[in-house]
Swiss-Prot record:
<feature type="region of interest" description="Disordered">
    <location>
        <begin position="277"/>
        <end position="298"/>
    </location>
</feature>
<dbReference type="GO" id="GO:0004019">
    <property type="term" value="F:adenylosuccinate synthase activity"/>
</dbReference>
<feature type="binding site" description="in other chain">
    <location>
        <begin position="38"/>
        <end position="41"/>
    </location>
    <ligand>
        <name>IMP</name>
    </ligand>
</feature>
<dbReference type="InterPro" id="IPR033128">
    <property type="entry name" value="Adenylosuccin_syn_Lys_AS"/>
</dbReference>
<feature type="binding site">
    <location>
        <position position="13"/>
    </location>
    <ligand>
        <name>Mg(2+)</name>
    </ligand>
</feature>
<dbReference type="GO" id="GO:0046040">
    <property type="term" value="P:IMP metabolic process"/>
</dbReference>
<dbReference type="GO" id="GO:0044208">
    <property type="term" value="P:'de novo' AMP biosynthetic process"/>
</dbReference>
<dbReference type="InterPro" id="IPR042110">
    <property type="entry name" value="Adenylosuccinate_synth_dom2"/>
</dbReference>
<feature type="binding site" description="in other chain">
    <location>
        <position position="224"/>
    </location>
    <ligand>
        <name>IMP</name>
    </ligand>
</feature>
<feature type="active site" description="Proton acceptor">
    <location>
        <position position="13"/>
    </location>
</feature>
<feature type="binding site">
    <location>
        <begin position="331"/>
        <end position="333"/>
    </location>
    <ligand>
        <name>GTP</name>
    </ligand>
</feature>
<feature type="compositionally biased region" description="Basic and acidic residues">
    <location>
        <begin position="285"/>
        <end position="296"/>
    </location>
</feature>
<dbReference type="InterPro" id="IPR001114">
    <property type="entry name" value="Adenylosuccinate_synthetase"/>
</dbReference>
<keyword id="KW-0658">Purine biosynthesis</keyword>
<feature type="binding site" description="in other chain">
    <location>
        <position position="130"/>
    </location>
    <ligand>
        <name>IMP</name>
    </ligand>
</feature>
<feature type="binding site">
    <location>
        <begin position="413"/>
        <end position="415"/>
    </location>
    <ligand>
        <name>GTP</name>
    </ligand>
</feature>
<feature type="binding site">
    <location>
        <begin position="12"/>
        <end position="18"/>
    </location>
    <ligand>
        <name>GTP</name>
    </ligand>
</feature>
Amino acid sequence: MANVVVVGAQWGDEGKGKIVDWLSEQADIVVRFQGGHNAGHTLVINGATYKLALLPSGVLRTGKLSVIGNGVVFDPQAFLDEVSKLQSQGVAISPDNLRVAENVTLILPLHRELDALRESASAATAIGTTRRGIGPAYEDKVGRRAIRLMDLADLDTLPHKIDRLLAHHNALRRGLGLEQIDGKDILRELTAFAPKLLPYAETVWRLLDIKRREGKRMLFEGAQGALLDVDHGTYPYVTSSNTVAAQAATGAGLGPGAIGYVLGLCKAYTTRVGQGPFPTEQDNETGRKIGERGREFGTNTGRPRRCGWFDAVLVRQAVRTCGINGLALTKLDILDGFDTIDVCTGYRLDGKEIDHFPAGEGAQARVEPIYETIEGWKQPTANARSWADLPAQAIKYVRRIEELVGCPIALLSTSPEREDTILVQNPFEA
């Protein structure tokens, strides 16, 4: 019996929410281990649509424990708003089924303001963030000046910690010509949050260690994708945390041995939000067709996603950096009806063929994709629940992806609905 880590194998938006929700039926505990409320999930269950950003997808399953780990950056207001919204849809959420690491870093309004200011300062240097304060909050965490959830339980020492935080931020704001922040305003806001948030606080590493020793099944839910990893992604156009599978251990407070099976998520094509290199992007009618069919708009931001063909080089790289054991391929149905489908099998850089994506920003901008053209299929794959429901050519496409990325397909998703999933290998039983 393996614990399972679910990570994106592209630039995020691969459909992790649905797959995690589908797998969570077999799990006892679902853990978010990095990121913040910048990465949204849309789940369709029995015709009802649920939108999650910060909460683990396990909250939609009764009888499951959901956990927000220490690797997450936590916006108090966004958390309370999301809980309230889901409760209004009939989802039961309380400290009985949701726990938050006491040492999680808090996102404050000053983080959101700084994030937006940086993005607006110059279009030439914009990264394309969601302006939700994720990056600045991680900066304060690394700078050892962050306010953490546990700090709200000690109002005697909280003013000192706020002063330490503002010593940095007010100096920065002076340089930017911004109004100084009064620590009393932050103290007042956090004091009001304390009774609403502290009931969820938990020593998560200890809780998970106890549950692991009891033999409970754990599902670790990543946000974004491996290509947005701050170390292994398309730097600097990345997120501010590690998104690879190894972060599941660090971001939850467990040792690496607690991680068993790594399931990577990828679409049958490729999308990206914001700035950065995208070798297979189709800024043409093909890209628009994929985007319209796939409803490629951000769950949280509504921003249209850039669309292109499947890039086997990048997914193969994610398989290696994440140690992926099996892939869940999503949105195969979006490619129904295409006469031909291109798949990137390699790159050409300065006239030479290469089999990996270079780390240098300049080289990334110069790579040219090498395509293999595959015959499409006319019969629908939407709502298929077994291999027998798939057209032969669609199966050939899936098998070719397996060959190119060097990893088997464990799951296949053919619609946003929870049950429209073809199981090849159960990650919990691998």
